[in-house]
């Protein structure tokens, strides 16, 4: 008898075997902050050394609080999970508070990703910071 495994279960097992923590896997599978924002207040893009491309969309509300953030990503599971975790860390914060997040903060949320994917966390944070800094500069 052959047991069927869902695609999600198969991906979860593959990512776990590769060294991704449960939160990182969930972020990757759910991709809840993927996409773009119509009429975004700021759009910024970075290309990682590995060739991954991240574009961040920011919607900023009253008193410089971040109302919404979305990423469009051409990249691996590490890039996607890192970007999704970064959104959870900045959403609802002020621009200045959001600029305080760092690679270590994102890593803690993800719990674990393979060492060879740590650059993905750096890319997610740098892309976010670039967007936040550009917003501040353009709206000073």
Predicted regions and their residues:
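Short, glycine/acidic-enriched capping/hinge loops at junctions between secondary-structure elements
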Residues: 55-57, 69, 82
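C-terminal binding/interaction regions
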Residues: 1-38, 42-43, 61, 93-140
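Alpha-helical support elements that line or immediately flank enzyme active sites
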Residues: 78, 82-93
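Immediate flanking context of iron-sulfur cluster ligation sites
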Residues: 64-74, 111
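Short Gly/Pro-enriched turn/cap motifs at secondary-structure boundaries
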Residues: 45-49
């Amino acid at each position: 008898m052959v047991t069927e495994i869902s695609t999600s279960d198969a991906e979860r097992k593959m990512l776990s075997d590769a060294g991704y923590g449960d939160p990182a896997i969930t972020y990757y599978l759910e991709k809840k902050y993927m996409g773009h924002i119509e009429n975004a207040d700021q759009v910024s893009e970075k290309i990682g050394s590995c060739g991954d491309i991240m574009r961040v969309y920011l919607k900023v509300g009253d008193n410089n609080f971040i109302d919404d953030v979305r990423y469009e990503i051409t990249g691996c599971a590490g890039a996607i999970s890192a970007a999704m975790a970064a959104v959870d860390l900045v959403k609802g914060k002020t621009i200045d508070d959001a600029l305080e997040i760092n690679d270590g903060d994102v890593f803690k949320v993800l719990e674990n990703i393979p060492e060879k994917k740590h650059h993905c966390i750096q890319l997610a944070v740098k892309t976010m910071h670039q967007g936040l800094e550009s917003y501040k500069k353009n709206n000073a």
